[in-house]
Amino acid sequence: MLDKFIMSCTRQLVGSSDKKRKKTQKPLDGVDVARDIMTENEPVFYDVYRDRARQGALPVIFDIHGGGWVYGDKALNDVYITHLARRGYAVVSPEYRLLADGADLKAQIKDLSDCMADAYKRREELGLDFSRAYLAGDSAGGHLATLLWSIAHSERLQALYGVQAPPFSVRAIGLSHPVPDPAAKLGGVMGANLRMLQKHFSKDPEILQNMSICRFAKEIPLPKIFLISCGKDALSPLSVDFAHWLEENGAEYVFKFYDKKDHPKLSHVFDVAFPHYEESQQAISEMLDFFEKA
């Protein structure tokens, strides 16, 4: 009961903050959105954003929203997504069930996998070029993005999570202030919250032992990763540790870190929450350049 109360409070507090923030923002003009596309397997929906002026099939970014696994929906990152779309990408924004509503990690992976497969099936209708496909995720969405990559490259994990590998290859992943390993040690309120969530990710101990890309360095090929973080973010130690892990395991990556002294206004997922910031535009540009070279 206490856990559900905490998740409910988190959802209300973050939701209130996001509503206040989004009242001061608006999506960029010139972007068309195909909304509420429903997958065949479950009543799971996704949206697709495209620059109105561009014709034909466009490279695809699957953007997985954050929200601590307990909050958010496919419209949460809509302003940020329009900044990606205006730069020539078709952006798929999937919905997934939340821990606060009684779902578990396996259900979240299933929803996201279904959205990816359905978008591929409709690629001609939606104008999606899957020869240039990328994943992006912020905060908890970063965890889900890297876990999806891991599952796609492991038959063992596909069996464990009850999903199939996507029918296309992902060329690179963009991560904003991610939680690559939800079981990582972290102090303070954020660390306490991660520890509380452990029992809600799954009741299956095998899932709990296999829910982070950091466990699979010898089992899967590692993705090319563009990693963004900042010193004011309480979760930044996780990004720093992840960058070290990528380095130790020979992954191709870029770590874009904005220190607190020179960038005092930047906080958790600033590039997604405030894409109009100069630093956000810089980070977005460099991430997309990284994608194009992947």
For each feature predicted by the language model, list its residue ranges:
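Alpha/beta-hydrolase superfamily serine-hydrolase fold, recognizing
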Residues: 1-294
